[in-house]
Amino acid sequence: MERFFRSLKNEWVTLGANYSKDKTRFVLWAPTATEVKLALYGKSGSNYTNSAEEVLAMTKGENGIWYIEKAGDLNGLYYNYLVTIDGKVNEVTDPYAKAVGVNGNRGMVIDLASTNPEGWENDTKPELVDPTDSIIYEMHIRDFSIDENSGVTLEYKGKYNGVWQSGTTIPGSDVKTGVDHLKELGVTTVHILPTFDHRSIDETKLDTKQYNWGYDPQNYNVPEGSYSSDPYAGEIRIKEFKEMVQELHKSGIRVVMDVVYNHTGATLDSNLNLAVPDYYYRQNSQGGFSNGSGCGNETASERSMVRKLIVDSVVYWAKEYHIDGFRFDLMGLHDIDTMKEIRTELDKIDRTILIYGEGWTGGDSPLSSEDAAIKANTTKYGNMQIAAFSDDIRDGIKGHVFSATAPAFVNGGEGFEETIKFGIVAATENSQVDYSKVANGTKAWANQPYQTINYASAHDNLTLWDKLQTTNPNASEEEVLLMNKMSAAIVYTSQGIPFMQAGEEFARTKINPDGSFNENSYNAPDSVNKIDWKRKVEYSDLNNYYKGLISLRKSHKSFRMNTTEDIQNNLKFIDVEDKNLVAYTLDGTNVGDSWDNIAVVFNANNEAKEVTLPGEDWVVVVDQNNAGIEKLATIEGSKVTIPAQTSYVLVDKSSFDEGEIDNGEDSDKPSEDTDNNKVEGNNSSNPSKTGDETSVLPIVIILLVSGLAVGVFAKKKRSLSK
């Protein structure tokens, strides 16, 4: 079938329903079909079970293409294809549908220009100079606003509109919630869990209790209808999704989509398989569908038309919806060449688009490990900006995610110093790290820091707060808070790209009705998954600590260097004799930082430890209570005593006293206006600023969400595919 791909290079052969005011051209790739017809169902979205009003025979073209052109303004007309294969007629929703009806069972012709909100053509992305300037906040549409204390208007709760509504506070207070909280916190980017049309929510029964993360895709090029104000009208979800992106951009926040191209929610009766049986999915040695996703199937990205489908879809979202980045679910199931092509095509649109993903699979796959986009193969991207999640730093901070009671550096484990150091240098090559002692590997896997996503928690597994409590059931809340603060301090002072789970900043917890912690809440009720905004008040100290760390990172380039060479030259670990103690210095003079020398110390022991710093006289800006860019204390001499379970960041007194803000970073200093998310800095090493295509650092961060996702995803996704 690969020969069919050649014809599709022709611009004329644009798959899907191609609308114009006076006609619409329908094009489907179905090379094994003996007959294809176009079924038209009228323009009533509420009449979603009616029989076809008109059925038209399509013409067979070259190389598997079927097409028909129908005159008239068909905007809003629902349609499907009737595909005959081996004498059986399959009703197929267009794999390239740009709009659908309720539950995604019928495609809809759409005039996309009519879905643009006012001012869409002038939508401006918040500036991003370097990928490492990103601060990513992972959230779920429903979780973010469904809580009774979110302050969001009732009809907007759990919807696209609830994400961007401004002026919201916890009722009866001035404590900010929603998008205003994000602006106050200082994040640059929201990563939104799957928002293209998925199977698990019945959009005709939204008055019943339903919940799902959405990792069971049905229609790749259409927003999910359950988050819209009207899932029956195909145009509404599109317009409201665009409004969400536009308003987030106005708030200085970029948008990353969590995309699930590695599998589909259905297999035998998926749109793809009904159109071209067995082509879109890999098979195992027994001839059945392979299951590297843990969800019943896995797409074959190495096949030309599957690769085309994925690349076309990503490009479509980037262009039509102004998306700023893509996080690839189970990226390890995609082949390296597909990921490279995605990066190349996105660079043609906007080099600042991030790409990152999970550098693992959810089970065994027939795709060769040499060709797979797994974490270990990140080096094969050269200097492309395709990033993977660092399970190294995640598990080094808090313990293995698949062993709930296993601790690590911050919560009582021993022997994780080198793993933390490996995370600090963004999993890049560094002679100061003893790779034989790194928990999850023995060598560097990233060529550049912008290829690494650092995090302590994500939607999978226990929340950070719940993990810390589980590993230390007898610890006081004050002790757990210190562990949480150190976890955050490690993430936000490490090189690479920082990432956090929504609510982590105020001790997010997921508690089941029986009082146990939920480690796989993919379909748990709102009571488990919602962002509990009252915790922002209860844990205001922790929230302010995160806010201060973000301010520190955004204000000082030393914490977000652009290249491995910069890290090797300007980050020096301090030799310490004590266990559970990591210390290092940063030379800011070579990376455009107003602070000449910075020292960072993590003392995970239950007692104070003394560290001798190079040079004398230091100013403390981060301690066990506060974080930021303001003076907390002054240290005379070179010896500093770090309290138990405490992180310290110190600055040499002379450069601190100069009172200058990081060169080129003035606009980064957090403020109440939307400019607090403008990222500026040293551009000298930003591939997007050079003409050298070989060193391009594609900013479509393929967030390889690291973590041994095999277990998590097998569990999560088997549950999704019944």
Question: How should these model regions be labeled?
Answer:
Residues I110, R343-T344, T352-A507, P513, ...:
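Conserved alpha/beta catalytic core and glycan-binding cleft of carbohydrate-active enzymes
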Residues A30, N75-G76, A633-D662:
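C-terminal beta-strand-rich structural cap/linker in extracellular carbohydrate-active enzymes
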Residues M1-K23, N50-A52, G61-G158, G162:
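The feature marks proteins involved in alpha-glucan
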Residues A30-E35, N605-N606, G615-E616:
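Short proline/glycine-enriched turn/loop motifs at strand-loop junctions of beta-rich domains
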Residues S436, G496, M500-P513, K534-I598:
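Glycan-recognition and catalytic regions of carbohydrate-active enzymes
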